[in-house]
């Protein structure tokens, strides 16, 4: 009997094994849909980004004007711009939910997949920061100045690295040009890393809500989960479209509608909302080098989760770990709120307390899992 073309053609076989006949645990929930949402959003961001790059000028005298030109003169330019800007926010929402689900259901036990995922997170954060600088408004300019200047905290070579990054002794035309080039390049590197992420995932198979081996209970990805993914994609597009068409600036900063002026400092310099939790941790350390280390460790600590926790139980079965996890989510939300506020009392002390709790959570959760397992064994 003749096999279908998708099972014999060398290229179609790759798509077939990844999207059609992929053996998938039958009990995965909607929380497993965020991976496909991230893939669609990445493609969407690359497409809108290329269209914006066709009309953008990477010159400090023309960058702000080119953004106004895109919004006013280019056919549907305002829509492309707002879809790209708000699409980045939605990308990070999906990314954080995806990571949160992996922590909650112990998916970080798939070491290679998890580590590549964290590298993708770091690359995405770098891409988003570079993109935030491109409109060349007040917050773009001062955000670039403040955040890149943090590298000067590195002993001996810090200031040299900063000058090399800036292309001079201050944020200038050279800085904007290289930031634009890197912002254009990084999404394609992220796409390659996503392929590696999927390669490792399909080697081991996906995790499931029970946290158990599901080799005896798997079904094809298509049509069961492909339809399920399409429903969430439709909801995602509807919500994003509603935001873009009715409140496109709700997630942005009004300061960025003022052209960059190196002589006037904004009252409160802050990054985009999806970096505010890490920014609050940075500000909570009075020492500059200590703050930079804390900022890096707020993300890098995710690499150590598989080392900290060797437990086989999913957090969904462990009420103590569950309470710690949801407390951790509240800590991140509060840190985001504190990062959006000025550096003054009582935000300083609250930020310091929450930063300590943020890092302690990564030690409490594995310990609670071990304790819970010992109690189960005793019973």
UniProtKB/Swiss-Prot annotation:
Positions with a binding annotation for heme b b562: 84, 183
Membrane topology, from the record: Multi-pass membrane protein
Kinase recorded as keyword: no
Xref: Pfam families: Cytochrom_B_C (PF00032), Cytochrome_B (PF00033)
One GO location term (cellular component): mitochondrial inner membrane
UniProt function note: Component of the ubiquinol-cytochrome c reductase complex (complex III or cytochrome b-c1 complex) that is part of the mitochondrial respiratory chain. The b-c1 complex mediates electron transfer from ubiquinol to cytochrome c. Contributes to the generation of a proton gradient across the mitochondrial membrane that is then used for ATP synthesis.
Protein name from the UniProt record: Cytochrome b
Species this protein is from: Epiperipatus biolleyi (Velvet worm)
